[in-house]
Amino acid sequence: MKLDSVQIRNLRNLQHVTFKPSHGVNFILGINGSGKSSILEAIHYLGFGRSFRTSKHKNVIQNEQESFTVFCECLEDSTTQRLGLSRSINDTVSVSINGIKGNKVSDLVSLLPVQIFTPQSSDILLGAPKLRRKYIDWCLFHVEHSFLTCSNAYSRLLKHNNALCRKQQVGYANPQRVYWTDLLAQYGSELTEFRNAMMTRLIPLITSNLAQFLPEFCVEISYYRGWEKGLELNEALTKSADRDYKNGYISVGPHKADVRFKISGKPAQEVLSRGQLRMLVAALQLATTQCLMSYTQKTCIFLLDDVGAELDAAKREVFIDRLLESNTQLFVTAIEEHQLEFIDKYQNKKMFHVEHGQVREES
C-alpha cells in the first residue's frame, strides 16, 4: 500500500494541509515546532488509530476546533483505496473506507501497515515486556487473519479469570472456575502457537540485519512464552492456582511472554550503548517490514522521525537503503539540511519544507 495523497485538517498546527508524497522516500524538513512531526502523527493515526506522542486525542485537535480529520488515497495493485479517520473532542472516532463510514478502527488499520522509528523507539528494549509482545503482535495482526480474534478472546478470558481469582467465595476446584480456566488455556495455547511461529520467521531476519547493523556483536535472541518449560499451559495454570487465587490474578500465560536479547550471556540493554540499542531496534523493525513483504506481499509505510538525532550518517543511510529494498514508502523528518546530505542518490524521492503548519514541496 502506497500513499498517493494525504489531507490533514485541524491536527495540531496543521489546519488545512494537502500533499502528494513520493512512493519511494519523502524527506520533510523544518525547525522544531514547524509541524513536520505532526505530519507523521497524522499518518500514524491511519495506521494505528492513535498518536505516538500523546494518549489524549483531544490534545491533538487544533485549538477552538471540535475534531481533526486525516484522509488519504492509497494505491495497491493498481487499485485506489480512500481511507479516513476523524476524532472529536468528546473522544468519539469515525473511520471511512471507500466512502463507507463506521467506528471500527481495526478495519482501517489492517489496510495500512505503518511503523515508526522515533527518539523513544529504544523503549522496546529498555521498557516492559508488554512492548516486546506488541512488537510480535503487530506483525501477526497484519500477517495472520485469525490472530486478532484469538488475541481478543484471550484478553477477555484473562480479565474474567482475574475477576474469579479475586472472588473469595469461588475456590479453584469450583466448576465455574475450572470451566473458565480451561477456556483460558485453550486460547492461550493458540495465541502462543501464533507467536512461536512468528518468532521462527523473525529471528533469522533480525540476525541477518544485525550482521550489517551491529557486526561487532553476536546477539542471542530467545522467546519466553510466559510459563515454565516442559508444561502445557493448562498444567502451568493448575500448578500456579493456589498462588494466583491468593494474589488475585493469573500469573502465567502468554500475557507474561517476552523476547530476550543477550550478548555473551548478559542482557543486551546492559552491554550496548544508546546508539547501538537504536541499531538493534532498527534491525527489529526492518525484520517486521521484510516479514510482511515475504508472507503477504504487503508493503509497509515507515515513519522515521528526527533522523539526525537517532542515527549517525552512515547508519541512517544503510537503514533507509534496506527499507527501500523491501519496497517501503518512507517519510523522514529532519531539522537541518546537512542531516540529509546523503539523499542525492535516491531517484524516487520528494522533499517537503514545513513552516508554521504550511507544507511546501520543493521543485
From Swiss-Prot:
Subcellular location field: Cytoplasm
Database matches in PROSITE patterns: RECF_1 (PS00617), RECF_2 (PS00618)
Binding sites annotated in the UniProt record for ATP: G30, I31, N32, G33, S34, G35, K36, S37
A single GO cellular-component term on record: cytoplasm
UniProt key word Transmembrane: no
SUPFAM superfamilies, A to Z: P-loop containing nucleoside triphosphate hydrolases
Gene Ontology molecular function, alphabetical: ATP binding; single-stranded DNA binding
Similarity remark: Belongs to the RecF family.
Name by which UniProt lists this protein: DNA replication and repair protein RecF
